[in-house]
């Protein structure tokens, strides 16, 4: 299959992956209305074309939490990335490092902190949930600091797991799930050889290191079901703020009042996010939620955004709507599944090229030049 656009990777990944893995990354909660709106609403945002602006000098470089990055894009945390390519978190981290942007390791990664951090020169970011097992949280934070992590992404929109019907249909969960996954793997020999046989161990590296024993996919599903804490509040984050000396980002903000609370709390950044449509179906798309949040806290806190971003045009749209940078999730996992590290590098190169075209034709020479004026008049609200 010829890859000529950043969006081509989804179809390529679907061909290569066993269905349980493809639908796990591709699916959303309930009827997936928010999942669809994330991409549709963002694609509907019209940019304002400008001409004759002498765009011979153009830069995508930006600053984020005191670090220079090549473009305002971060590889966000995606659980089980190591099931999509052999030692997938390491491959994705290397791709991000080579492209000059941060990589965020998920709590629920296959590769542990100690395997990923030494593989790259740039300090990676680490994502953590508020969990019932506070001992695990302290252990993970201590290990992340020891590995040189400076930026913590705290995900707060999972007090309970979302209802993801596709997982039961595909074999990720539900009756006879293990047998169904085995049959699917046999039917996808390339993945079975590269990842299934040669990508082991297939456990949750960060959790196994804490528990002192390997964890299976069934353990993963059970751990999710029992360890997320519906009682969480801002008070649960206070001890983390005292413990963690580096930048702390609150991920899962979708309302201006919560964004204001994050500022009061002393967070360094927020991620405007509906978890890629994987938690509460029927909520606003990130593209629709972002402008009001930016109006409420822009300048008081660094604003990142995710959910629905597939192209360089989408990155420009999100920044015009009020984000300082964006996180990629599904988009980079599709590329990772298709061609590993090289696929992610190519995806980021395509996104960079798409951003350059969009900035050239909207008259934005620097990332700081992208704002509401970059949108068509009808989009400015």
From Swiss-Prot:
Assigned EC number: 1.1.-.-
Cofactor: FMN
Enzyme type, top EC level: oxidoreductase
UniProt GO BP: aerobic respiration; lactate metabolic process
Molecular function via GO: FMN binding; L-lactate dehydrogenase activity
Active site per the UniProt annotation: 275 (proton acceptor)
Membrane topology summary: Peripheral membrane protein
Annotated Gene3D superfamilies: Aldolase class I
FMN hydroxy acid dehydrogenase domain mapped to chain residues: 1-380
Reaction(s) catalysed (UniProt annotation): (S)-lactate + A = pyruvate + AH2
SUPFAM superfamilies reported in the protein's UniProt record: FMN-linked oxidoreductases
Cellular component GO terms held in the UniProt record: plasma membrane
Residues that bind substrate: 24, 129, 164, 278
One Pfam family from the record: FMN_dh
Record keywords: Cell inner membrane, Cell membrane, Flavoprotein, FMN, Membrane, Oxidoreductase
Major place of residence: membrane
Top-rank taxon: Bacteria
Cystine crosslinks: none
Binding site for FMN: 106, 127, 155, 251, 306-330
Function: Catalyzes the conversion of L-lactate to pyruvate. Is coupled to the respiratory chain.
Family in the record: Belongs to the FMN-dependent alpha-hydroxy acid dehydrogenase family.
Protein's recorded name: L-lactate dehydrogenase
The species this protein was found in: Yersinia pestis
Gene: lldD
């Amino acid at each position: 299959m010829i890859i000529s656009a950043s969006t081509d990777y989804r179809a390529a990944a679907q061909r290569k992956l066993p269905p349980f893995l493809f639908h796990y990354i591709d699916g959303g909660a309930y009827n997936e209305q928010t999942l669809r709106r994330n991409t549709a609403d963002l694609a509907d945002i019209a940019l304002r074309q400008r001409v004759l602006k002498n765009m011979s000098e153009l830069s995508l470089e930006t600053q984020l939490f005191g670090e220079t990055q090549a473009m305002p894009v971060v590889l966000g945390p995606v659980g089980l990335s190591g099931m999509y390519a052999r030692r997938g978190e390491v491959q994705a981290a290397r791709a991000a490092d080579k492209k000059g942007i941060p990589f965020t390791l998920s709590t629920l990664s296959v590769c542990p902190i100690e395997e990923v951090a030494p593989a790259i020169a740039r300090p990676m970011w680490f994502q953590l949930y508020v969990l019932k097992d506070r001992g695990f949280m302290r252990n993970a934070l201590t290990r992340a600091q020891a590995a040189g992590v400076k930026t913590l992404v705290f995900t707060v929109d999972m007090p309970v797991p979302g209802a993801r019907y596709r997982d039961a249909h595909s074999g990720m969960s539900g009756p006879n799930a293990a047998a169904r996954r085995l049959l699917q793997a046999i039917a996808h020999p390339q993945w079975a050889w590269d990842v299934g046989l040669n990508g082991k161990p297939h456990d949750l590296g960060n959790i196994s290191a804490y528990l002192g024993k390997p964890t299976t996919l069934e353990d993963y599903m059970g751990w999710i079901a029992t360890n997320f804490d519906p009682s969480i509040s801002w008070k649960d984050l206070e001890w983390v703020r005292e413990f963690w000396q580096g930048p702390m980002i609150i991920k899962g903000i979708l309302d201006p009042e919560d964004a204001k609370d994050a500022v009061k709390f002393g967070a360094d950044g927020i991620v405007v996010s509906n978890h890629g449509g994987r938690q509460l179906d029927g909520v606003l798309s990130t593209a629709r939620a972002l402008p009001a949040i930016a109006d409420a806290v822009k300048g008081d806190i660094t604003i990142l955004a995710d959910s629905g971003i597939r192209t360089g045009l989408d990155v420009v749209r999100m920044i015009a709507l009020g984000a300082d940078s964006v996180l990629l999730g599904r988009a980079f996992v599709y590329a990772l599944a298709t061609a590993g590290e090289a696929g992610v590098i190519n995806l980021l190169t395509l996104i960079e090229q798409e951003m350059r075209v969009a900035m050239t034709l909207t008259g934005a020479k620097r990332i700081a030049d992208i704002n509401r004026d970059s949108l068509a008049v009808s989009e400015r609200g």
